[in-house]
A protein has these predicted regions:
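Outer membrane beta-barrel strand-and-loop segments of large Gram-negative receptors
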Residues: 198, 290, 294, 298-304, ...
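Surface-exposed extracellular loop regions of Gram-negative outer-membrane beta-barrel proteins
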Residues: 268-272, 324-333, 376-392, 400, ...
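Flexible loop and strand-edge segments within Gram-negative outer membrane beta-barrel domains
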Residues: 180-186, 196-202, 215-260, 268-296, ...
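N-terminal periplasmic "start-of-domain" segments of outer-membrane beta-barrel proteins
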Residues: 10-41, 66-71
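Short acidic/polar hinge/loop motifs at secondary-structure boundaries
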Residues: 92-119
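Extracytoplasmic beta-strand/coil segments of soluble accessory domains associated
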Residues: 45-92, 96
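Periplasmic-side early beta-strands and strand-to-turn transitions of outer-membrane beta-barrels
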Residues: 123-124, 136, 143-145, 149, ...
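Gram-negative outer-membrane beta-barrel transporters
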Residues: 360-366, 374, 475-476, 481-485, ...
Length: 665
């Protein structure tokens, strides 16, 4: 599928509450997904997953991924359930205040006008969380889009978004509903009565009012979402919900006049997540723990000043993010009842300031930025009680911690003529541990992972160089990069069941005990490239990502030295074709291939290489209405997503075929 280059940095017209693209962004590795790119996907994470090296923690989309594994990472350096990428909607972070993951069902592709993906640590205006890059979503500011479809596996989907103008007011509204009966992840002889469907029901609604004022454009936005899903095991389910409110005031820079932005937001979320232990023959499950509630609240403020004077553009800004949350859980299931209760949580905050700018002279663009951030982890606690008597069994109050991080970026781009550009860039970034990583232990089947309140922020250093050429009939570009993550947060294996451990308690046969730890460093070298060519009515596209990431566990985790990070493939590639078969008929297809992954930190559980073919046929029945038939994993390939300690593999969705109607105005 073709991707656009980032929007022209000279664009200054603002029809939504966001500053125009900064000139500095052209010096870094960026991909833009247009509205037409998004129209082919049912879910936002599937749309961004078209870019090689961009993926959720596992090889599953949000159709079947547990909320706690919907974190997204770029470049396959070290995928994480919490995600190592900052995801924003017009500047407001979408990352969950408790876990750092993103509940992708809160937004439908129809509600967006485009997505900008910037790979490499996001210093400058982005700050904490943008360790491997930034995914910037842009909400629709014109037109109407609606989509209705049905398919096998009980798939039903309806989504609509519209913008209307009345005087100096602009109104935006969006709603979506997505339902699936799901599929059973475990297949073949290994499947037992314990294995059930990953059913899904998700809904969201959002609205926005933009108003022109004497100070600038004022935007008020609110949104709500909820999803309920099965985890593929009898008795294991998850329910995630939340809402967000934001206020933004923007004055776009015009000519040499000063532009600025002020933004405030508040996000709340909650998560129910139940886990089970699986019998050795997979004939049954037993309740293991019930994470009944995870109430969390995130607040944020940011502001920026920007001005362009000739070839110089500068921006000064500051931002603050505060998260407060806890988990309430029942666990230790014995004799038909949970015997222990646990409440754990705390607060995190990051406050930072930055200076960012660029200088354009002739064929040269020089861009750079510097940030200073102060992070804090405070008021942490973990209290465990006897469920029957209320007696306190454990009361931990880890000491408050804080620190400062300086990060920056520098990039140089030169126009070589004949539509060819070369660039080089360096950057640093950091990501503090989420409340989930600090305080919440979790269980998947028979595998238990313990929390760690002493986790330090992850830090990344990187260098990259690239060259690109774009013409009327196509483009080609390539980037080579080196990244190092210091103190990466890794799920480190401590032992295997059956057995009882000082932390984690009893681990059954076929399970392992892990703990989140800062494990040395991860070094990654890689190459990413893409090409596109238009031949008459046919557009051919391809993309490649090769990332060799290796762990050096040092003295803390020497058993990891030389291993690849869990869920990090070396190779991934896509090939796409889009053809206008007639004035009304269009065919699009994408072939995706990925090399093997490892399920675990010790690289003992191998996930085989995987490929899938997707295709879609569109027929324009009216000027504004399109009927389509689409197939995901059209050849029904077996795509491994997980593997247990006793060798049982889980798989991604089988073939899904759907038919639908789309309205676009």
């Amino acid at each position: 599928m073709p991707f656009d280059t980032p929007p022209s940095v000279e664009q200054v017209i603002v029809t939504a509450a966001r500053l125009p693209p900064a000139a500095a962004e052209a010096a870094f590795s960026a991909v833009h997904l247009s509205e037409s790119d998004l129209a082919k996907s049912q879910r936002v994470d599937e749309a961004v997953g078209q870019v090689p090296g961009v993926s959720l923690f596992r090889r599953t989309s949000s159709l079947s991924a547990n909320p706690t594994t919907q974190g997204i990472s770029l470049r396959a350096i070290a995928p994480s359930g919490a995600g190592r990428t900052l995801v924003t909607l017009d500047g407001v972070p979408l990352n969950d205040p408790f876990g750092g993951w993103v509940i992708w069902s809160q937004l439908a592709p129809e509600s967006l006008t485009g997505i900008d993906i910037v790979r490499g640590a996001g210093a400058g205006p982005y700050g904490a969380g943008a360790l491997t890059g930034v995914i910037g979503l842009k909400e629709r500011d014109a037109g109407i889009a609606a989509d209705v479809s049905v398919g096998n596996l009980g798939s039903e989907r309806a989504s609509a978004a519209a913008v209307s103008t009345l005087g100096r007011f602009e109104f935006f509204g969006a709603a979506s509903y997505d339902k699936s009966d799901g599929y059973v992840p475990v297949r073949g002889p290994a499947q037992g009565a314990a294995d059930t469907r990953t059913d899904l029901e998700a809904k969201s609604i959002s609205g926005r009012v933009d108003m022109a004022t004497g100070l600038g454009l004022l935007s008020l936005r609110g949104g709500f979402f909820e999803e309920d899903r099965g985890a593929g095991l009898a008795g294991a389910r998850a329910n995630a919900s939340g809402n967000v409110f934001s206020a933004t005031l923007v004055q776009a820079p015009r000519g040499a006049a000063l532009g600025w932005k002020l933004q405030a937001w508040r996000r709340t979320s909650d998560l129910f997540n139940s886990s089970v232990a699986v019998a050795a023959d997979r004939s049954s499950t037993t309740p293991a723990n019930s994470q009944d509630k995870t109430p969390a609240t995130g607040w944020g403020l940011n502001g920026a000043l920007r001005q362009k004077l000739g070839g110089v553009e500068w921006e000064l800004g500051a931002d603050a993010r505060l998260n407060d949350g806890e988990e309430r859980e029942r666990y230790s299931y014995m004799a038909g009842a949970y015997t222990r209760n646990r409440v754990t949580g705390g607060k995190t905050s990051v406050v930072g300031a930055y200076a960012d700018g660029s200088w354009t002279t002739g064929p040269w663009l020089v861009a750079g930025g510097l940030r200073l951030d102060h992070w804090e982890t405070t008021d942490g606690f973990r209290v465990e009680r006897n469920a029957l008597t209320g007696a306190v069994l454990l009361d931990q109050r880890p000491a408050d911690r804080d620190g400062e991080v300086v990060s920056g970026r520098l990039g140089v781009t030169r126009d070589l003529g004949q539509d060819t550009t070369a660039r080089i860039a360096g950057y640093t970034g950091f990501r503090p541990a989420s409340l989930n990583e600090l305080y919440r232990p979790f269980r998947v089947g028979n595998d238990v992972t313990e929390a760690n309140a002493g986790l330090k922020p992850e830090r990344l250093q990187g260098l990259e160089a690239g060259v690109s050429r774009k013409g009327d009939k196509g483009l080609i570009e390539a980037t080579a990069f080196w990244n190092r993550i210091e103190d990466p947060i890794v799920n480190v294996t401590l032992g295997a069941g059956p057995g009882t451990f000082p932390i984690g308690g009893f681990i059954p046969a076929g399970g392992v005990l892990r703990q989140r730890q800062n494990a040395g460093t991860i070094d990654a070298i890689g190459l990413e490239g893409r090409a596109e060519r238009k031949v008459g009515a046919v557009t051919l596209s391809s993309a490649l990502s090769a990332t060799d990431a290796r762990v050096d566990g040092g003295s803390d985790a020497p058993q990891l030295t030389g291993k690849r990070p869990a869920q990090a493939p070396i190779w991934s590639a896509t090939a796409g074709l889009s053809a206008e078969l007639s004035e009304k008929l269009t065919l699009a297809s994408d072939l995706t291939w990925e090399g093997k992954r490892f399920e675990d930190d010790l690289n003992s559980r191998v996930l085989d290489p995987a490929w899938r073919l997707d295709a879609r046929l569109d027929w324009r029945v009216r000027p504004l209405v399109t009927a389509y038939v689409a197939g995901d994993n059209l050849l029904d390939a077996n795509i491994q997503t997980s593997r247990t300690a006793d060798g049982v593999a889980g798989y991604s969705a089988p073939r899904i075929v759907r038919v639908g109607l789309r309205l676009a105005i």
